[in-house]
Amino acid sequence: MMIKKVERFFKSDAAGGIVLIAAAALAMLLANLNATQELYTGFLSTPVELKFGALEIKKNMLLWVNDALMAVFFLLVGLEVKRELVQGSLASRRQASLPVIAALGGMVLPAALYLAFNFQDPITRAGWAIPAATDIAFALGILALLGSRVPPALKVFLMALAIIDDLGAIVIIALFYTSSLSMVSLMVAAGAIAVLAVLNLCNVRRVGVYILVGVVLWTAVLKSGVHATLAGVIIGFFVPLKAQKGHSPAGTLEHALHPWVGFLILPLFAFANAGVSLDGVTLAGLASLLPLGIIAGLFIGKPLGISLFCALAVKLKWATLPPGVSQKTILAVGVLCGIGFTMSIFIASLAFGDVDAALVTWAKLGILVGSLLAAVIGYALLRSHLSRAP
């Protein structure tokens, strides 16, 4: 009886989101209990080294999760978005343009709101990109809690929006927060992308070949100084989708990756990244301009930017809403996109890490509060609206 209940749980649409939230809650608990704090941080700091001839990759456990395992998640997202671009709800130009326009609004307005609070301070002004990011893993995890009530087109819209948002964040990091890029590694990455394109054009249908070239691409992107998860999206876009003799390489790979991503990779990601220590944090500090600017950017700027840009695009006939999706739903999804979390924390560490550790702490507090508000209110709005939908 118990086994059947467990099986039913893992087959439910909301299971992945529940496991993700549980892993995040456990991480917060371990990171803030005196008895487990050192054990938790020690585990994430454990160095793991990979050597292959002259190639050497040495990262701690946290970075292996974020750079390697999350590339697999982005591979799955790339496969799903490609399918929708070719066959599904993003197949027309006007439908595909909506998440691009939404992502632009979701980056511009949060950054502007942050600067409204912090423009006068040349030090905190450098953190303008912190609220421009969206944590796609947590946003999709919260959406998964709503199960089958979520229209497929809405999930695809959120995935596409978040991918473009992430690409924008990667470009921002490369242009404004990275001191040097390895041109040799970027050239190797470009060569790997060219090989993937040739494989696709020649209709090579063995998934293993794409994965092999993808490993080279991931390594090159990692060594270049650009966020390595970008490689996953690129690989996903080149794996052939068209079915022949009832077999679609992209479809088969997508089906195989789903349980691993939902019940292993994303919970590990949540466990590794959600453990933000609250040592030294006071509620009084929340009134300072740095965290206030981040909270305003994530919780107010994100939904306003996304919904306003979408409404304008639809009014000007530049884009159309996905089937079964209304402007109210777009606003609710915009709130959910205010979950900046890991990408926002990463940008905060780049902006303030070499300046003042206290600024990083206050930025993390703002990110945590803003992301939590976005998650709770976004979930409540979507649940309410989707429950009333016909």
UniProtKB/Swiss-Prot annotation:
It comes from the Bacteria. Keywords: Antiport, Cell inner membrane, Cell membrane, Ion transport, Membrane, Sodium, Sodium transport, Transmembrane, Transmembrane helix, Transport. It catalyses: Na(+)(in) + 2 H(+)(out) = Na(+)(out) + 2 H(+)(in). The keyword Translocase does not apply. GO terms for cellular component: plasma membrane. It holds the Pfam family Na_H_antiport_1. The chain crosses the membrane at residues 14-34, 61-81, 97-117, 126-146, 156-176, 181-201, 221-241, 256-276, 280-300, 305-325, 330-350, 362-382. GO terms for molecular function: sodium:proton antiporter activity. Na(+)/H(+) antiporter that extrudes sodium in exchange for external protons. This is Na(+)/H(+) antiporter NhaA.
